[in-house]
């Protein structure tokens, strides 16, 4: 009786060079995005601190500048 090989042998989990390069690019992109996000967070914090300083110095004038005049 003949036996049939179903190909159920062990498969090696190997990655092609392209997959490795793609993962390296993804990792670099993630690092770049993290750096951009950190810089933007710092910029936003800086702007908010500046607004707080202006409000602490002269809140009344700041609010008056945004009040609509003459129904406009």
Swiss-Prot record:
Q: Where is the composition biased (Gly residues)?
A: 1-10
Q: Where is this region: Disordered?
A: 1-45
Q: Where is this cross-link: Isoglutamyl lysine isopeptide (Gln-Lys) (interchain with K-? in acceptor proteins)?
A: 72
**Pfam families listed in its UniProt record:** Pup
Instruction: List residues modified as Deamidated glutamine.
Output: 72
Judging by the UniProt lineage, the source's domain of life is Bacteria
Q: Which UniProt keywords apply?
A: Coiled coil, Isopeptide bond, Ubl conjugation pathway
Q: Which InterPro entries match?
A: Ubiquitin-like_Pup (IPR008515)
Q: Where is this region: ARC ATPase binding?
A: 28-66
* Free-text description of this protein's post-translational modifications in UniProt: Is modified by deamidation of its C-terminal glutamine to glutamate by the deamidase Dop, a prerequisite to the subsequent pupylation process.
Q: In which pathway does it act?
A: Protein degradation; proteasomal Pup-dependent pathway
Q: Which residues form a coiled coil?
A: 10-60
Renumbered to this chain, the Basic and acidic residues biased-composition regions fall at: 33-42
What GO molecular function terms would the record report?
Answer: proteasome binding; protein tag activity
Please tell me whether the keyword Coiled coil is annotated for this protein.
Answer: yes
Instruction: Give the UniProt record's GO annotations in the biological process aspect.
Output: modification-dependent protein catabolic process; proteasomal protein catabolic process; protein pupylation
Provide the function of this protein: Protein modifier that is covalently attached to lysine residues of substrate proteins, thereby targeting them for proteasomal degradation. The tagging system is termed pupylation.
**UniProt note: domains:** The N-terminal unstructured half of Pup provides a signal required to initiate unfolding and degradation by the proteasome but is not needed for pupylation, while the C-terminal helical half of Pup interacts with ARC to target proteins to the proteasome.
The record's subunit annotation is:
Strongly interacts with the proteasome-associated ATPase ARC through a hydrophobic interface; the interacting region of Pup lies in its C-terminal half. There is one Pup binding site per ARC hexamer ring.
By sequence similarity, the record places it as follows: Belongs to the prokaryotic ubiquitin-like protein family.
Task: Tell me the protein's name.
Answer: Prokaryotic ubiquitin-like protein Pup
Give the originating organism.
Answer: Streptomyces griseus subsp. griseus (strain JCM 4626 / CBS 651.72 / NBRC 13350 / KCC S-0626 / ISP 5235)
Q: Which gene encodes it?
A: pup
């Amino acid at each position: 009786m003949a036996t049939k090989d179903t190909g159920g042998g062990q498969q090696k989990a190997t990655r092609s060079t392209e997959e490795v390069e793609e993962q390296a690019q993804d990792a670099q992109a993630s690092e770049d995005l993290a750096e951009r996000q950190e810089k933007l967070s710092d910029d936003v914090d800086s702007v908010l601190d500046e607004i707080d300083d202006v409000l602490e110095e002269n809140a009344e004038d700041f609010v008056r500048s945004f009040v609509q005049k003459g129904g406009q």
